Amino acid sequence: MHAAQARLERRQALRHGSLLPHAPQTVGFFCMDVSFISATLVLPAVVAALAPEGSRWAGDAVILVKPQFEAGREHVGKGGIVRDPAAQQLAVDRVEAAVRGLEGEALALIDSPILGMEGNREFLLHARFA
C-alpha cells in the first residue's frame, strides 16, 4: 500500500514541477521515460524546472513516446496494446505538438529498440529547445 502511494505522489509531484526545484542550471540534456501519465503533461514542468530564472531552457531531450499513454483510451486495445499504426502516429503527433508548444523542435524519431510492457511499439523522439 505505501509503495503505490509513494509512486502516485512522485508522479503528481513531477507533473507539477515540485520534484525538480533545485535542478542544476547547467543541464543541457534530459531523457524522459514516464508511465501512467502522458509525456505532454510532464514535459512543461521539466522544461520550466530546468530554465534559468527569467529565461527559457535550451538543450536537447530524448522522450520515450508510449502510445498507450498518449493516443487516448479509445485507441488502447486488449492488454493495453495500441496496434493501429494511425493511433501510434497520433501519439507521436501529440508529443511533437507539446514540444512545439514549448518552442522546441522535433528533430528525429526512431522506433525504440525495446518493446514496451506487454509488447507495445514505442518511439524515441529527439527534441531541441533553444
Model-derived regions, located:
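S-adenosyl-L-methionine
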Residues: M1-V42
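Non-cysteine beta-strand/loop elements that form the S-adenosyl-L-methionine
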Residues: R11, A61-F69
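A short glycine-rich, Lys/Arg-flanked "PGG" loop and its adjoining helix->strand segment in the class I
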Residues: T40-V62
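Short, glycine-/aromatic-enriched active-site segment of Class I SAM-dependent methyltransferases
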Residues: P67-D84
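Short alpha-helix
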Residues: Q88-L102
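Conserved S-adenosyl-L-methionine
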Residues: G104-L115
